[in-house]
Amino acid sequence: MTLLFDKTGPIDSPTLAPASVDNHCRSPDRSAAARVIEIGLVNNMSDAALRATERQFMRLLRAGSGEHLVRLHCFALPSVQRSPATRQRIDSLYADIADLRHTRLDALIVTGAEPRAATLQSEPYWDEMRALVDWAEANTRSTIWSCLAAHAAVLHLDGIERERLPQKCSGVFAGEQVNDDALLSDLPSPLKVPHSRLNDLAADRLAARGYEVLTHAPNAGVDIFARQGRSRFVFFQGHPEYDATSLQREYLRDIGRFLTGERHDYPEFPVDYFDADIEDALDAFRAEAEAARDPAIIARLPHLALRQGTAEGIETTANALFRNWLISLASEP
């Protein structure tokens, strides 16, 4: 799936809308002369999140493209476990990851993946991820590494091991800028970034190996950090690309897994995410669910509502980040 779009046109793709003749959206009066920013998306998210991840990054790239044309190429690591239906979809719509060797890209976005093993080195995609890090270093001007992909990249590059958290970091956290960087230009203060992870990278260990921490959240730790080598690598421990209800969907998924016995512990609700009254109702539902572990009681889950300003804060932060990233790509030769 290769898409060409700019801020003025809708994204036209097999994922989002009925496809037009060539699945491209372009501005005819500008595209012939304008330089196109070529970006690859290596989408390794779970089957359930695959399409949402496509939409989220497409939306942010379109919103941030301004006067620039952006062409997005979609890839996926073949060793990520897939259902037959999802594998067929990837095979029909995505480019083969081997095609990266023959594709000129300005930048890359690499998503995380659902953990399957206790360590990154034991994941089935570990060798492919290592090779991707090396390729991106040699062949892109900038690459974004998101969540688990960020952890994998720093482990391969500098041997920095992530640390298991005592409980999952899930919520929308208020981050603050701790270093000046063009990537952070005109970002709101505080930043609002969703996090959803079981592991963490310590700021002091990153700094000791030459990484620059750009933003930090008191209750979530390092948020965005960067490394300048042959390519400028930008790392997200969180998920700025998430839409407003992504954490809600994950929370409901985990409740369902608890009720069916797929997980032994009841999930905590995301921090600073749901309305305070809803949190009280969710605590009451949890007590009921733990007392009577029955999938049927999901019908009694209270109606969910987000805290005021949450959706707007997430969107404003993410739009500014990706706008600044695209500006940096457009300004370089």
From Swiss-Prot:
Gene3D superfamilies tied to this protein: 3.40.50.880
Predominant cellular place of this UniProt entry's protein: cytoplasm
One cellular component (GO) term of this entry: cytoplasm
Binding site residues for substrate: K168, S196, R253
BP terms from Gene Ontology: methionine biosynthetic process
Site label Important for acyl-CoA specificity, positions: E114, L148
Record-given protein name: Homoserine O-succinyltransferase
Provenance organism: Rhodopseudomonas palustris
